[in-house]
Curated annotation (Swiss-Prot):
SUPFAM superfamilies: Zinc domain conserved in yeast copper-regulated transcription factors. Residues 63-92 are annotated as: Disordered. GO terms for biological process: copper ion homeostasis; intracellular copper ion homeostasis; intracellular iron ion homeostasis; negative regulation of transcription by RNA polymerase II; positive regulation of transcription by RNA polymerase II. Residues 1-40 bind DNA. It comes from Schizosaccharomyces pombe (strain 972 / ATCC 24843) (Fission yeast). Changing C339A: Constitutive nuclear localization. It is found in: Cytoplasm; Nucleus. Gene3D superfamilies: Copper fist DNA-binding domain (3.90.430.10). GO terms for molecular function: copper ion binding; DNA-binding transcription activator activity, RNA polymerase II-specific; DNA-binding transcription factor activity, RNA polymerase II-specific; RNA polymerase II cis-regulatory region sequence-specific DNA binding. Copper-sensing transcription factor that regulates iron uptake genes. Under copper starvation conditions activates the transcription of the copper transport genes, ctr4, ctr5 and ctr6. This is Metal-binding regulatory protein cuf1. InterPro entries: Copper_Homeo_Regul, Cu_fist_DNA-bd_dom, Cu_fist_DNA-bd_dom_sf. PANTHER family: TRANSCRIPTIONAL ACTIVATOR HAA1-RELATED. Keywords: Copper, Cytoplasm, DNA-binding, Metal-binding, Nucleus, Transcription, Transcription regulation, Zinc.
C-alpha cells in the first residue's frame, strides 16, 4: 500500500483480492483505495447542513454529473477521508497530481436553492466530519451554532413541592422511604407538639434549597424525628436506648429514668424535657407541670415549658463542640457532652436524663415533705421544728442530716 498526497493507493489485483493493505507493487498501475462504508450521496454543503442544522433531507443537487464536484468557492479544509470520499475525479496513475482543495472553483450548471444559491443560509464552517460528534452521533455542544432553527432538547421534568414551589430535587418522601423509623415514631406524629401540615407556605421549611442540605436533613428527620421550627425549639430524638445506657455507664451518669425522656433544645441553648409518649395528650408531663397547648396553632409555647436545663451549670464543658463560636470537627459520630452541632448524641441525652431524674427525685421529696409537715401540723395543731421534723420524717436519713441533729426515740 502506497500513500500519495494522503491517499492510499494499491494495484487492482490486490484491491480485488482484499490485499490492499499489503500491496507493495511498484510496476503496476495503482488506484485509490475506497474507504469502507456506504458511498457519499450528498454534496459538501448538504453534509454540513445535515450535521449543523439536523436537515435530514435528500440532496436536491440532481444537476451534478459524474466526475464533477458541486460546491461553491470556499476555503474549507477537509481531511484525507473526506477528500477520498468526494465524487471528484481522482487521478488514475502516479504521474497525475491531485489538485489542492483551495483551487477548486467549480459550480453546478444549474443552480439549486438548497445547494448553490447566491446567498447560502449557512456560512461555511471548518468542521471535522468525523471527530466533532459525541458517542451518540450528535454534534458537540460547543460546535452547535446559536440559531433559531436549532432544535433544543426538552428539559427534564422538575418536581414541585407540596405548596407549588419548583424543586429540581427528589421529594422528601422518596429520600426517606427506605429509612427505618423509631418504634414510637407514630406516637410522635400524633403528639400535639408536631409541626402542623397545613400552615401557610411562608413558614414552610423548604428542603429543596440545596441538594446536600436536603439529603442531610432528610436523614436526620428520619432518625431523630422532624425538627420543630415554629415555637423556637428543636426536638432531640434518639431511639437508641442502648447507646444512652452505654453513655451513662461510661460517664457514671446515675440515676437514670426507666425510659429515656425526649428533650427540646431552645434557641438560647437550654434543654427542656417534653412529655413522654405514654402521656402525650395529658394536661401535664411526667414532672407534674402543666403545659399550655395552643389549640389554634397546635404547638407549645416555649415560655410554658418547665425548668430549662443548662448543662454548663452541672458539668464542665471543655470540648470546643459545646462553644457557640466553634463548629464540630468530630463528624457524625460525635459523642461530646453538650455538642451544639449534634445535640442529640447519646452522651448529651444521658446527661440530660440524669439531671432530670435528680430533679424529679427532688420534686417528689419536696412534695412528700410538705405533705408530711401539713399532716403533722393538722393533727397536733403546732409547728414542728427542723430537728423534730428531721427525726420524724422517713425522708431525712443520716446521709442528708448531720448526726448531731438527729434525735432517737419518739417525740
Amino acid at each position: 500500500m502506497v500513500v500519495i498526497n494522503n491517499v492510499k493507493m494499491a494495484c487492482m489485483k490486490c484491491i480485488r483480492g482484499h490485499r490492499s493493505s499489503t500491496c507493495k507493487h511498484n510496476d503496476r498501475e495503482l488506484f485509490p483505495i475506497r474507504p469502507k462504508g456506504r458511498p457519499i450521496s450528498q454534496c459538501e454543503k448538504c453534509r454540513i447542513a445535515r450535521i449543523t442544522r439536523h436537515l435530514h433531507v435528500k440532496c436536491t443537487c440532481n444537476s451534478r454529473k459524474k466526475g464533477s464536484k458541486c460546491s461553491t468557492s470556499s476555503t474549507t479544509d477537509l481531511d484525507s477521508s473526506s477528500a477520498s470520499n468526494s465524487s471528484c475525479s481522482i487521478p488514475s496513475s502516479i504521474s497525475e497530481k491531485l489538485l489542492p482543495r483551495d483551487n477548486v472553483k467549480t459550480h453546478c450548471p444549474k443552480r439549486s436553492a438548497s445547494c448553490c444559491g447566491k446567498k447560502p443560509d449557512v456560512m461555511p464552517l471548518k468542521i471535522n466530519l468525523e471527530s466533532q460528534t459525541d458517542f451518540m452521533g450528535m454534534p458537540l455542544q460547543s460546535q452547535r451554532p446559536h440559531s433559531e432553527s436549532y432544535r433544543m432538547l426538552p428539559e427534564p421534568e422538575k418536581f414541585k413541592s407540596e405548596y407549588g414551589y419548583p424543586s429540581q430535587f427528589l421529594p422528601i418522601e422518596k429520600l426517606t422511604s427506605n429509612v427505618a423509623y423509631p418504634p414510637n415514631y407514630n406516637n410522635y406524629l400524633k403528639s400535639p407538639y408536631q409541626q402542623p401540615t397545613n400552615f401557610p407556605p411562608e413558614i414552610q421549611y423548604n428542603y429543596s434549597h440545596s441538594p446536600q442540605h436536603s439529603i442531610q436533613e432528610a436523614e436526620e428527620a428520619a432518625v431523630y424525628g422532624p425538627p420543630v421550627y415554629r415555637s423556637g425549639y428543636q426536638i432531640l430524638y434518639n431511639n437508641n436506648t442502648d447507646s444512652i445506657a452505654a453513655a451513662a455507664a461510661t460517664h457514671d451518669l446515675y440515676p437514670q429514668p426507666d425510659v429515656p425522656l425526649t428533650f427540646a433544645m431552645l434557641a438560647d441553648g437550654n434543654y427542656v424535657p417534653l412529655p413522654s409518649s405514654t402521656n402525650t395528650y395529658g394536661p401535664s408531663n411526667s414532672y407534674g407541670y402543666e403545659i399550655n397547648i395552643n389549640e389554634s396553632t397546635n404547638h407549645v409555647d416555649s415560655s410554658y415549658l418547665p425548668h430549662p436545663i443548662q448543662l454548663s451549670n452541672y458539668f464542665t464543658l471543655p470540648s470546643s463542640c459545646a462553644q457557640a463560636d466553634a463548629a464540630c470537627q468530630c463528624g457524625d459520630n460525635c459523642e461530646c457532652l453538650g455538642c451544639l452541632t449534634h445535640p442529640n448524641n447519646a452522651t448529651t441525652l444521658a446527661a440530660l436524663n440524669h439531671i432530670s431524674a435528680l430533679e424529679k427525685e427532688t420534686i417528689s421529696h419536696t412534695d412528700l415533705h410538705h405533705t408530711f409537715k401539713h399532716e403533722v401540723n393538722s393533727s397536733n395543731n403546732y409547728e414542728l421544728t427542723n430537728d423534730e421534723l428531721a427525726a420524724s420524717s422517713p425522708l431525712y436519713t443520716s446521709s442528708s442530716v448531720p448526726p448531731s441533729h438527729i434525735t432517737t426515740g419518739s417525740t
